[in-house]
């Protein structure tokens, strides 16, 4: 859909404003230092006579390499540019090396550090705002304090029919303030501001966020790759006050974690929130901007639509904003339900986003044993015995494969690595079950009490693991309680969305069996 253009925009020009005139993009000279690649720190390259092996023990991974790949990845123990790699690996062109490195980046086996920028692009920072005058002022003040050339950035605040207007709260700040007399929503407000922006890059932030000083400098270098149209940074929480705030500090759906990743549907990072998003302006306008008919899920819709059209997106935790999360119980649960309600619409629009659910055989056999033992006593342990046999066979096979390629590891180290892999599979199964099926599973457990121990075990694995992994400032019991409340609210919203869209697609994932 085309970006919204509303005729009733009031302009309020501020000191330091460009007056809406387009600023010619500056020619970018060759970077002082090109992009550089390096192996993830948990990986090692083991060289052999016929090639080598890319080895990782956590998680367990062993990839066979030919001689060229072994030489190339061996060089990546230290950061190297494509030109440096081409000089050290005879017979591989820079294009072939780039394609190979790109495949490894997608699997999160490499780290890419972008080229150093010598000329910074013109950036327009867009803040849609409806009310929250004090928060909006704090947000703008953080942007004025950015470590970024003032003559290369423009700040637009889109006052979306705030009552009272935001002009008084922002009157002394050097920004452009645009006002809508009728509320059009965040998406339309962003689109309208984008059409009036002078920058070649649009930086979106919400008025309940505060940008850290190096926000733009941390993200913009990643646009050195012309195929990358969107970059998102990390969204962190302020110091927690209260249980919900402490929970949001570690479980917010806006925080994508501490690791760089390419953004694709069903990947570890599947979308980027608009409260911390940089987009090439020409790409946003070419693909219609944000869907103004959506009040929730518009960020996922825009990201997936742009990816579908051949562009790429990356998540980079280096560019951070601090987000003032909803911490009132009612607001928090309503927002989670709203997020859930958007899933049915998004999965209808984007079949490529169809959820995948892995079914690990060993985990399912163990759960089956827990369910059968109360009925059959000792004989109910049969599935657990089968699971142990499968694990032993897999362990023997892994040990044999490693020896075949010249890697000698003790049976204990391989067993621990393999055990972690299966524990991770159980965690992901549990996380899916808690998020989508906890209420119906508990109803089934109430009707058939013999199945309740297995159901409770399945549902408790994910919150237990997350409490240990995330280390929230909450007791285990409080964390588990909030975890359950959050996902009950999400499920209620999910079912509401399924009913509105007349589909069960979000509840019917694509199932993949795993060992």
Region spans (language model):
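Acidic, low-complexity/disordered tracts enriched in E/D and polar residues
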Residues: 2-75
């Amino acid at each position: 859909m085309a970006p919204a253009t509303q005729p009733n925009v009031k302009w309020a020009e501020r000191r330091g404003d460009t007056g809406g005139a387009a600023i010619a993009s500056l020619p970018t000279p060759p970077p002082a230092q090109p992009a550089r690649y390096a192996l993830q720190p948990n990986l090692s390259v083991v060289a052999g006579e016929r090639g080598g092996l890319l080895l990782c023990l956590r998680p367990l991974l062993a990839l066979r390499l030919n001689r060229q790949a072994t030489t190339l990845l061996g060089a990546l123990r230290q950061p190297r540019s494509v030109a440096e790699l081409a000089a050290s690996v005879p017979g591989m062109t820079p294009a072939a090396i780039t394609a190979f490195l790109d495949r490894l980046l997608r699997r999160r086996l490499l780290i890419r550090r972008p080229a150093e920028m010598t000329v910074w692009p013109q950036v327009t920072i867009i803040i849609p705002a409806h009310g929250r005058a004090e928060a909006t002022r704090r947000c703008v003040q953080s942007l004025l304090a950015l470590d970024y050339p003032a003559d290369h950035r423009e700040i637009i605040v889109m006052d979306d029919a705030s009552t009272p207007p935001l002009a008084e709260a922002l009157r002394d700040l050097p920004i452009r303030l645009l006002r809508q007399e009728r509320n059009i929503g965040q998406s339309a407000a962003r689109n309208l501001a984008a059409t009036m922006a002078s920058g070649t890059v649009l930086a979106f932030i919400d008025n309940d966020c505060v940008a850290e000083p190096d926000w733009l400098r941390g993200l913009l270098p990643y646009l050195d790759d012309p195929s990358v149209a969107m970059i998102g940074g990390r969204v962190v929480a302020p110091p927690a006050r209260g249980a919900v705030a402490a929970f949001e500090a570690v479980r917010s759906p806006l925080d994508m974690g501490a690791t760089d990743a390419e953004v694709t549907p069903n990947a570890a990072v599947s979308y980027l929130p608009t409260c911390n998003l940089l987009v090439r302006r020409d790409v946003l306008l070419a693909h219609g901007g944000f869907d103004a008919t959506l009040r929730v899920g518009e960020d996922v819709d825009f990201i997936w639509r742009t990816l579908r059209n051949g562009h790429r997106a990356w998540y980079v935790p280096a560019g951070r904003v601090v987000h003032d999360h909803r911490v009132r119980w009612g607001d928090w649960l309503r927002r989670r339900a709203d997020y859930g309600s958007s899933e049915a619409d998004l999965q209808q629009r984007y079949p490529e986003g169809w959820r995948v659910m892995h079914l690990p055989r060993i985990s399912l056999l163990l759960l089956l044993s827990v369910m059968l033992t109360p009925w059959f006593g000792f004989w109910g342990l049969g599935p657990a015995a089968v699971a142990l046999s499968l694990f032993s066979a897999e362990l023997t096979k892994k040990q044999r494969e490693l020896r075949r390629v010249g890697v000698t590891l003790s049976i204990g180290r391989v067993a621990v690595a393999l055990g972690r892999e299966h524990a991770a599979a159980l965690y992901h199964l549990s996380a899916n079950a808690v998020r989508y099926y906890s209420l119906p599973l508990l109803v089934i457990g109430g009707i058939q009490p013999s199945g309740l121990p297995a159901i409770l075990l399945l549902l408790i694995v994910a919150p237990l693991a997350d409490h240990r992994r995330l280390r929230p400032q909450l007791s285990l019991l409080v964390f588990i309680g909030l975890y359950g409340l959050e996902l009950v609210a999400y499920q209620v919203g999910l079912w509401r969305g399924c009913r509105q869209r007349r589909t069960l697609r979000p509840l019917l994932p694509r199932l993949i069996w795993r060992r």
